[in-house]
Amino acid sequence: ELEMQDIADYVSVLDESDIKYSTFNRYITHMHTFLQFLKMKNIEVLKFYPERFLKKGFSEHNERSVPEKTIAHLIKELPAFPEHLQLMYLILFCTGIRKSEVCTIKSGAFYSQGNENWMRIYQSKMRREKVIPVPSLLVGLVNDYEKKYGIKNGEYLFKNKKGGAFNGQTFSNQMIRECKVRGIACGDYIFRAHDYRHNLATSMYGNGVSIQGVRDYLGHSSENMTKQYIDFMPERIVSAEDKYFSKNQSFKLKGAEDDER
């Protein structure tokens, strides 16, 4: 027969284990679910209140930006990749859009207006179309690709064998295969398209774009989500504070001047 002391002992073991707070909470939730299951089977169980044991904490930030060394190696080897992968990677690198969005780009999505260059994309997660700025060189490369392969306006830029949109997993698999052949790797993995969103978000924020601006560009619904894409955030906050106080060395707390008089 299960007693409250048994649960207390189990929680104590978990508490002393070297596990994340989220893992701890998951174990507590699983235990509650199991007891509820027994209750549904008409097996008498003690009353268990998981909220008394759950820990409070903050979600961990995973640094996922692709190292510059890896990017430099990949770009150096890129001319040897199949042409469609070359262009898909450059779009990913320059825009940080989702892999699914790269695969569903249509001819005519890249265009110029005066000295400005734009890309029109449909963000499936947000269910809306938006326009983002892109380098002029990228627009030229896309236009050349469309002309070379006779891709008509409105057709998918990257097609599967049946003429539909290119498959996202196929893109990843082909990139991994090409990277393996050339010894390109990123630590314990070879290629993850989504990590380039971290690179772009981190770069934008590091160059003075506000959190709100980065959020709007990436198409997130909240700033908290956007912060998960900005790597080295604590270091950047400390750096910003150092810069502020170095420029305001005469800064004094209110009342300090009066005390000196």
Identify the meaning behind each predicted range.
Residues K162, Y244-R261:
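C-terminal secondary-structure termini that scaffold catalytic or DNA-interacting sites
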Residues F110-G114, Y189, V209-Q228, A256-E260:
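Short, polar N-cap/turn motifs at the start of nucleic acid-interacting alpha helices
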Residues T95, T104-N143, R261:
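Conserved tyrosine-mediated DNA breakage-rejoining catalytic core shared by Y-recombinases
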Residues I151, N173-D216:
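Short, basic (Lys/Arg/His-rich) helix/loop patches that form interaction surfaces
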Residues E44-K76, Y122-Q123, K159-G164:
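Flexible interdomain linker/hinge and immediately adjacent N-terminus
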Residues E1-N62:
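N-terminal core-binding DNA-recognition domain of tyrosine recombinases/integrases
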Residues G57-E60, K69-K99, K125, R197:
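Basic, Lys/Arg- and aromatic-enriched nucleic-acid-binding interface segment
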Residues Q123-R127, L218-K243:
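Catalytic-site neighborhood detector that most strongly recognizes the C-terminal catalytic loop/helix
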